[in-house]
Amino acid sequence: MDTTTSNPRIEASAKYIRMSPHKARRVVDQIRGRAYEQAPMILEFMPYRVCDSISQLLSSAAANANHNFGLSKTDLFIDAIQVDGGSFLKRIRSGARGRTYPIHKPTCHITIVMRMDSGWRNKISLRRFGK
């Protein structure tokens, strides 16, 4: 964790989330680069199961910023968020003639990096979306 007080780097990670990394990346791409206040609203209206895990992780990162650096949650934005593949849970399915077939249930690791919002980021996002 970066200990400089000018623009600290706040990290939070969740490991072994029982979701395919491909499905989690679909959700993560929607909130990357957004302000902290916008991200929970976006996640709330998305119909995917992984949104709950990402929302919990997001609130954990904001709590880390508040507790460790004394930053307000309104000043934060998501600088980086990444989804990496985890290990597979291996299960067995019964097959014909006494055979067994493997089932691989994927897991993923999600890492969020948040930073303090300096005013230029809001101007760029407003310009990008034409508001």
UniProtKB/Swiss-Prot annotation:
SUPFAM superfamilies for the chain: Ribosomal protein L22
Main location: plastid
GO cellular-component term (any): large ribosomal subunit
Pfam families documented for this protein: Ribosomal_L22 (PF00237)
Coiled-coil region: none
Gene3D superfamilies for this protein: Ribosomal protein L22/L17 (3.90.470.10)
Intracellular or extracellular location(s): Plastid
KW Membrane (keyword) present: no
Molecular function GO labels: rRNA binding; structural constituent of ribosome
Swiss-Prot/TrEMBL GO biological process terms: translation
Similarity comment text for this entry: Belongs to the universal ribosomal protein uL22 family.
PANTHER family registered for this protein in UniProt: CHLOROPLAST 50S RIBOSOMAL PROTEIN L22-RELATED, LARGE RIBOSOMAL SUBUNIT PROTEIN UL22M
Functional description taken from the UniProt entry: This protein binds specifically to 23S rRNA. The globular domain of the protein is located near the polypeptide exit tunnel on the outside of the subunit, while an extended beta-hairpin is found that lines the wall of the exit tunnel in the center of the 70S ribosome.
UniProt protein name: Large ribosomal subunit protein uL22c
Species annotation: Aneura mirabilis
Gene assigned in the entry: rpl22
